[in-house]
Amino acid sequence: MNYEARPDASDSAQCAAGMSDKVAANPLDSDFIAEMTRIFRNAWVPVCHESELPEPYDFRTTSIGNENVIICRAPDGKINALLNVCPHRGMLIERRPQGSFLEGQASGNPKRITCMFHAWQFDMRGNCVYVAREKEGYQERFSKDDAGLRRLRCTVNYGGFVWVNMNDQPVSMLEEWAGPAFGHVEQQLNSVHLEVVHYHKEYVEHGYMTEALEFLSAAKHGSLFDFGHCAINANGDN
């Protein structure tokens, strides 16, 4: 199927008003950087549901924009969001999609988040608790207190969903950011017990029917709780 997109008068008007007429594909593209900065670094993003972390030391990994994030439950039951990057050499720490730190990793101790590069270890709040050869290699020039994982703004609300904001000083808190539009949704979400019971991934060989499936199928846009809203990607990812 060949289709040539031709800009019409409305497209020209939008471009004239300052809207870009191209898709940002290069990570260094100014539009892409603006999107990461103005949207993903300032919005409250739902990353998972609290039921996915039922026990202390349970974790999930995800990404917000182009940043890798660990969501984990601390021993006191609090859910924390941490940047999934070691402050030592910028290594991606946890590559598994989910699991538990209770038993420890191959290169670390139980109940620790461990970077496999140099075995630096962190607790569930992101505090650095172990540095290999700390005294021999750093003497008094270094303190673990200054080497923790970056903690992100994190809260649980609206039916138990975990929301994260990449901005250390958010422009607004979640409730203010959500605004009146969330009033009806909040009532629905909080009126029933929500729990993630399994994960489902669906591969689509071709994406030519994506638009019809996404906008016309009753199963996609029925009751919020009767049907699951599945994201469909033209590349066949979901």
Regions found by a protein language model. Give the residues of each.
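Small-side-chain structural scaffolding
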Residues: 46-48, 81, 206
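A generic alpha-helix structural signal
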Residues: 36, 83, 212-215
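Rieske [2Fe-2S] iron-sulfur-binding domain
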Residues: 52-168, 172-174, 179-180
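C-terminal catalytic domain of Rieske-type non-heme iron oxygenases
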Residues: 73, 78, 156-238
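A generic alpha-helix preference that emphasizes hydrophobic side chains
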Residues: 32, 83, 151, 208-209
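Generic structural signal for secondary-structure transition and capping sites
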Residues: 43-44, 91, 220
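Residues at helix-coil transition
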Residues: 40-41, 88, 216-217
